[in-house]
């Protein structure tokens, strides 16, 4: 299934322990229908070398709503920009 939420979009959590938090989408797993949001579902992991590490966990796609879509920048060719300025 194709997801409407893409990497870089701003979303708000609507259910769960992090309800009401807003963040930017870091990663999307379309097969499992899960997304990773910055600052939401922060998990702590202990590593022998680095000590305690904090990392965002994946949350279900249905638990968030889209606030602002990821912006797409228009690609312009060099020829088009030269002809406009000339």
Swiss-Prot record:
Alphabetized UniProt keyword annotations: Ribonucleoprotein, Ribosomal protein, RNA-binding, rRNA-binding
Protein's UniProt keywords contain rRNA-binding: yes
Gene3D superfamilies: 2.30.30.30
Superkingdom, taxonomy of origin: Bacteria
Matches recorded under SMART domains: KOW
InterPro entries, sorted: KOW, Rib_uL2_dom2, Ribosomal_uL24, Ribosomal_uL24_KOW, Translation_prot_SH3-like_sf
GO biological process, one term: translation
Gene Ontology MF terms in the entry: rRNA binding; structural constituent of ribosome
Cellular compartments per GO CC: ribonucleoprotein complex; ribosome
SUPFAM superfamilies: Translation proteins SH3-like domain
Functional summary from the UniProt entry: One of two assembly initiator proteins, it binds directly to the 5'-end of the 23S rRNA, where it nucleates assembly of the 50S subunit.
Subunit structure: Part of the 50S ribosomal subunit.
PANTHER family linked: MITOCHONDRIAL RIBOSOMAL PROTEIN L24
Family per record: Belongs to the universal ribosomal protein uL24 family.
Listed name of the protein: Large ribosomal subunit protein uL24
Source species: Bdellovibrio bacteriovorus (strain ATCC 15356 / DSM 50701 / NCIMB 9529 / HD100)
Gene this protein is translated from: rplX
